[in-house]
Amino acid sequence: MIKAVHLTHYYNKDLALENINLQINKGEFICLVGESGSGKSTLLSLLSTLLKQTSGQLFFEGKNYKDIEDIDSFRRTNIGFIFQFHYLINYLTVKENIKLAKEKATHEEIYNLLKILKIENLIDKYPNEISGGQKQRVAIARALINRPKVIIADEPTGNLDSKNSLNVFEIFKRLSEGGTTIIVATHDKDLAKFANKIYEVKDGKIS
């Protein structure tokens, strides 16, 4: 599904990633573990087309990223993003926050997705009326509403307690079993055990 070949990236003259070779298959649950500043977030940004690599090649389903004409459309169609901070808009309901990602999403479509995440009762609630763990599930729903082939999550449980963190990774596991490719950066090696593959990122290299 996603293949990185000799991927290298610099920020100005500072080396962030060096000679990364990586194959990620459909439905795999991949965890990138490592300390802050190790290169995890940079790698996620490159894999998701948010950054353009300094050198090397990236492929999605066999097609070179550089040959994709409308990169914004590609990203919206194929990739869902989840971050440490959920970025929900407080004056919009849960339903309205999700519709930001897909304006034409129906009530039934949103309700069914929230039901999978066990928060369907929150559909008309506002963010300030729900817990941190529930907010992150809403963020997951928003990432899933376009039925992306890949979910990319950067420290998605950084602000959650252990119970809610566990719940989020259980959701990721179920999604991967359903065929969605999951790529998560985390510093929590215990949570990473949910993944099919774990890569350690250190000083811009993976092992």
Task: List PLM regions with ranges.
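Conserved signature/switch motifs of ABC ATPase nucleotide-binding domains
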Residues: K125-N128, I145-N146, G178
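Helix-to-loop junction immediately C-terminal to a conserved catalytic motif
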Residues: S48
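Conserved ABC ATPase signature
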Residues: Y126-Q136
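ABC ATPase NBD coupling module
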Residues: Y65-G80, E177
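Catalytic Walker B motif of ABC-type/P-loop ATPase nucleotide-binding domains
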Residues: I151-D154
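Conserved ABC transporter NBD signature motif
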Residues: G56-K66
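Conserved ABC ATPase "signature" region
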Residues: T106-L122
